[in-house]
């Protein structure tokens, strides 16, 4: 069960330094990431694959299903980010076949989140939370990350910005 965890920084009066890292295919997850950035002033980073997914929806779902079933690692492009500069890291993913998208999993598994407050969120087209939080817990707990609560958003956040704002506040990540 997720619990609210207030963000802490190296100095008690300083605002937490935030980074948002996301993977998005259709743009829904990108809208969540950009909403968090707009509300907090966070630095934002996009995970991109070396080999793109098919443009059309159905072929993409078939490729993604095979990747998940066979644990196929899709190579991701390097991101110029130094996580040691951040107190809070927001990870945003689409829910693909009820799981965290493999490109974000690939990127996150290669990072050191020790001592960081990590907030996780997923967008979906009707499937809900499913296993995305469990996926994040499996990836992040061994790194020493402190997990905040998880946010699940259906579609984009154009109509859910209040939900994103409440999630940030519940985790001690206030507006800029």
Residue ranges, per PLM feature:
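Short, conserved loop/helix-junction motifs that constitute active-site signature segments
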Residues: 84, 109-115, 127, 141-142
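Redox-cofactor binding/interface segments in oxidoreductases and associated redox assembly factors
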Residues: 91-92, 120
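Glycine-rich, phosphate-binding/catalytic loops in enzymes
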Residues: 106-109, 136-138
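Short, glycine-/small-residue-rich phosphate/pyrophosphate-handling segment
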Residues: 119-158
